Amino acid sequence: MADHAFHRPGPLKQANKAHKTGRHRSKGAIDNAQKGKIGLRPISHKHKQQQRKEQRRNQMNQLRKNKREEVLEQKRKLGGQNTAPFLVCLLPMHEQIDPMSALEILKSCDSELVVENSPSGIVYINLPRFKQRFAFVTPPVGRGNELIALDYLKVCDTTLLLTTAAFGDDEIFDRWGQRIFNMMSAQGIPTPVVALMDLESINPKRRPAAKQAAQKVISKLLPEEKIMQLDTASEALNVMRRIGGQKKRILHNVANRPHLFGDVVEFKPGSDPSDDLGTLEVTGFLRGQSLNVNGLVHIPGLGDFQLSQVVAPPDPYKLDKSRDGENSEVRLLDRSDPSKRTSLQSENIPDPMDAEQTWPTEDEIAASQAETKKMKLVKRVPKGYSEYQAAWIPDVEEVEDPDGKDDDDMSEDDDDDKEDDNEDFMSCDNKSFEDEYEKRDSDTEEFQDTVSVASEAAINDEKYDQQMDFQEERETLKKLQQARTDQLWPDEIDTPLDVPARERFQKYRGLESFRTSPWDAKENLPADYARIYQFQNFDRTKRRILNEAKEFEGVLPGLYVTLYVINVPESRWNAFKSAQLMDNIIVYGMLPHEHQMCVMNVVLQRMPDSEVPLKSKEQLIIQCGYRRFVVNPIYSQHTNGDKHKFERYFRPYETVCATFYAPIQFPPAPVLAFKVNPDSTLALVARGRLLSCNPDRIVLKRVVLSGHPMRINRKSASIRYMFFYKEDVEYFKPVKLRTKCGRLGHIKESLGTHGHMKCYFDGQLRSYDTAFMYLYKRVFPKWTYEECLVRTAEHERQHASANRRSSQQVAMEE
């Protein structure tokens, strides 16, 4: 093989200088990064343990088994031999449907079925075929009974919605059905089952089309529900099987607390006849969580009470009657300790010597007025500014107050704050409104024209006018006009001519930035804040209390028990019995702190069919969780941040946050807002949820002062009509200005003595532009909480005196 010659470089080979990229990456490194190449990495000695295929399969089977056992455990807690029966609410969606006829069909579904009726009207059905038992309740139907139906639905396990095919495809739900369905949707529907009745009464050829039309209507409201037929015994058996076998929907607001639907109720007066107190014995099946006998219970319509003991009588509705000999005696489950009972005190009693923020005395006011007359070096700071907020305001020369008046003596409330508070209590019972509106109708009839009318059309017009409330029409029109004005020019008000602006807006202040400027949540608090309770961390407390309620070992749910509710006023109980349409009562076990007053914040959304704007501080009936009460809430924007802008009106299709004083309640809790109609019925105007119980939520009311450019010279302009006194211009000089076109500026100096001022902006002003000054003050709700309880004569006298004290306090504040 021939030898091959290879080139060998000599010592004089050219060596090019290496390219140095410096601090930036080279083109090659950038190219490698874009291609996704990864550099070399040291091998870690900690290898992750990779599961084999069999191990992964076993893990999935274990998780599936745990979930299945959890579901079965939830099912075993209801309807069995030693558990509470399925509580089913029969709710017609049409006023013409008789729920008792549907109940008779259900009673005939099986030959071995056992039916028993309780003294309060609950129908117990034991079905040995399924080894299950059921309890059926039927709330009253018709306009005015919505609240009773909502109370029943709060504690039921299943809702059996009854519809009919006898009135055609368009009458699956009538007006009553639509109204109650909207309310129960806002509150939360327990596991729904829809049954179609009277399908056998129509032509057999039209039955499939009628059922399909009904299914189409139901699918829009309840997409996951399939309509069932309820006309025969076999169909009733299918409905019972569906109720007992379907997965139950959990309403956490009720599931987090113990509750009892009263089966037998008995009131026993106390030993002292002059005391007017007695013991209320409520018997029924305990549901939800374990009951703490040392805690408080709430009965809607009666109030909050303490328990003395809990006993377990024999269960009269057992599935297997052959075991009646077992546990035939009354057993004492738990007895409360008087030293450990939760106190019924709902308000904090402030100590006047504990440095609480209270109204100053006359001596303090006189001393303050004498001090302000002295010559001193001051800063002109809007009232309410703290030291760190006023640090950027420049010092001014010495001034002397010629009048010697304190700014606090002047009223600062806007025109919309000078409205008269409605001192009349509006109860949730429709009968309480009849006297007021009958009197109004009688007054209206006195002014009716008594001249005989010949034509029939004129007679109809006269009848129509007699049924109309002209005062309510005028008030609604005025409210609509004010809401429209506030929507077009939000928060804009005219500077008064006769009162200096520095006195009119003495409690307002300017903010550098609404989002970032600080505002102390503890300054200038009202006296009512000394009466409430506050948590250091509400969310943390909520989690702790809910976890403790689940782990508490008290009276276990599912037992047939008797609660001894002590210190119930006999007069209130008699009034409650006379006002109730049904013999059932509901008892809720309250969590710790849920009877103490606080500032409650709820998120509300207007209902689609409610179009009249709601004014802030207008009276509403609020149902929050298991409570129902009357308050005058204030509204604010539902936004992130530590400050929230006050809303004068709650307009249709909007979402706001309502703030008011109410007892503490831990979320989740649905919220329903009702307004009283002129015919004394209730209309659902908003729905929402409980946000928090936090008094530190800062709600700022904004006023906008507007001025118009008189002369414009590039970035400077002369503004007029914002103020009418030279002193006002100097007082508000530190506050920034904003224009409608987005310019920012500030006041340079005053021009003349009539409020004209020279201002500088960050750009050229347009002749059609308008200068604005934003001022803010913190607003608080008024203490108008009134729980919806039955009223006795003594309570009416106490309420009247409380209203007089409240009106005197409001007059002093204004």
From Swiss-Prot:
Where does this chain mainly localize?
A: nucleus
**Acidic residues bias: start-end ranges:** 395-426
- Per UniProt, the ranges with Basic and acidic residues bias are 317-340, 431-442
What PROSITE patterns does UniProt report for this protein, alphabetically? G_BMS1
All copies of domain Bms1-type G, residue ranges: 84-249
Q: Name one matching Pfam family.
A: AARP2CN
Instruction: Show the InterPro entries listed in the entry.
Output: AARP2CN (IPR012948), Bms1/Tsr1 (IPR039761), BMS1_TSR1_C (IPR007034), G_Bms1/Tsr1_dom (IPR030387)
Q: Which GO terms describe its biological process?
A: endonucleolytic cleavage of tricistronic rRNA transcript (SSU-rRNA, 5.8S rRNA, LSU-rRNA); maturation of SSU-rRNA from tricistronic rRNA transcript (SSU-rRNA, 5.8S rRNA, LSU-rRNA)
Name positions with the PTM Phosphothreonine. 444
Residue ranges of coiled coil: none
The lineage's top-level taxon is: Eukaryota
Where do the segments described as Disordered lie?
Answer: 1-67, 316-357, 392-448
Reply yes or no: does the keyword Nucleus apply: yes
List the Gene Ontology MF annotations in alphabetical order: GTP binding; GTPase activity; U3 snoRNA binding
Q: What does this protein do?
A: Required during maturation of the 40S ribosomal subunit in the nucleolus.
User: Under what name is this protein listed?
Assistant: Pre-rRNA-processing protein TSR1 homolog
What gene is this protein translated from? Tsr1
